[in-house]
């Protein structure tokens, strides 16, 4: 006969939470001590956003979509995943489209915050700024570091759906952190083609505390 019980203890001197597992196996007690995984973050919400599908641009460095953690924000953002979806409606010239870290954001069209999906409706409202670029109202940013990129499809009817995943497989937390005043954008790396249709899907968490996962 085997009986298993759990004893929860307060954090030890190092601050780690300890759980003692007691097993009764054929009349013999066996004790196992395990550490419970904790995080230095206070999670405020996990969010999902799917952009409009916008037409391609012939302009090099044209920015289609951007998201920014406001400069006065008291939260951090952690990117979980980015999905790029690009369709070629006619024969088109292939180019690279990339995602970059940015440290400023102006221009473009503001996206209504109600279009951001809370993964749990009980989460707090998100604080991010999201904008879409157009030829008449282009987005301007300060480009910092290239995060990822892909080549566009060539033939009519071809499409690309590619996911860049930054989440930890165990707890789905990400260590790709965007502090106040930081964000990401999606842009042409060369002169593009109007026969592309482009959207992105982003998932992120907003939290208080430090970004390191322990």
Task: Outline where the language-model segments fall.
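Long hydrophobic alpha-helices with heptad-repeat/coiled-coil character
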Residues: 2, 49-54, 161-183
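Short, well-ordered helical secondary-structure segments
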Residues: 66-69, 165, 171-173, 189
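A surface/secretory-pathway sequence property marking extracellular, secreted
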Residues: 113-121, 125
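Extended, solvent-exposed segments with strong compositional bias
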Residues: 122-176
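Ser/Thr/Pro-rich, low-complexity mucin-like regions
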Residues: 170-207
